[in-house]
């Protein structure tokens, strides 16, 4: 993690502009072709949810602007963000939030996430003040066409919130809607486009 020198930061003017906005957050929703991911997890007997969480995390960390954070009034560039996933408890309508680093490949991450989820007995199992997270969730019961998230009113909140819905058939391909909610002080449409391109390319390469 390194502190950003705002006097020479290429984003300083935009950061100050959006810092004056009372609600600098926005959300976009787009379609993702998950045909190859669906095939891959079926062949490898992996969780689609955890596998997508792995790929989403990789795509987030590939775009520098997603890794900016505010700490103690200063702007910092994080080394990486860590996925924090909502996960339904087996046989229950209640969920808990599973947080773990993205290590190894997809299969290793899926196994680690499954083991941690099974062992976790509380809603949270991490430092709630940690702002290097990615909030990840899924609504597999319906197609997602838009999403907003609960939050405290804090313009310094820089945690990306990423949610996707149920996949379905579209012209012989499996696609789903994905919502990404971000802070405009750091992230513009250009950066969301880079995230999408990386995610789709990684899925297509499976």
Q: What does each model-identified segment do?
A:
Residues 156-206:
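Active-site-proximal acidic secondary-structure segment that organizes catalysis
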Residues 21-39, 80-104, 175-181:
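Acyl/amide activation-and-transfer machinery of modular secondary-metabolite enzymes
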Residues 45, 49, 106, 188-192, ...:
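Short, charged, low-complexity patches
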Residues 3-4, 30, 40-44, 59:
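Aromatic-residue-lined binding/catalytic grooves and analogous aromatic/hydrophobic interfacial grooves
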């Amino acid at each position: 993690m390194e502190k950003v020198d705002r006097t020479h930061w290429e984003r300083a003017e935009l950061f100050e502009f959006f810092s004056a906005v009372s609600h600098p957050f926005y959300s976009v929703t787009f379609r993702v072709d998950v045909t190859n991911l669906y095939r891959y997890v079926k062949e490898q007997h992996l969780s689609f949810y955890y596998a997508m969480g792995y790929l989403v995390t990789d795509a987030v960390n590939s775009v520098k602007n997603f890794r900016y954070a505010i700490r103690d009034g200063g702007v910092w560039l994080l080394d990486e963000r860590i996925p924090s996933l909502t996960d339904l408890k087996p046989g229950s309508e209640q969920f808990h939030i599973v947080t773990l680093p993205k290590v190894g490949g997809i299969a290793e991450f899926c196994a680690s996430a499954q083991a941690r989820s099974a062992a976790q007995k509380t809603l949270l199992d991490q430092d709630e003040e940690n702002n290097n997270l990615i909030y990840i969730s899924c609504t597999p019961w319906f197609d997602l066409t838009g999403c907003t998230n609960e939050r405290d009113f804090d313009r310094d909140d820089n945690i990306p919130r990423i949610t996707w819905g149920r996949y379905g058939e579209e012209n012989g391909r499996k696609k789903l809607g994905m919502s990404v909610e971000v802070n405009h002080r750091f992230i513009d449409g250009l950066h969301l486009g880079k995230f999408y391109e990386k995610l789709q390319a990684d899925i297509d390469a499976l």
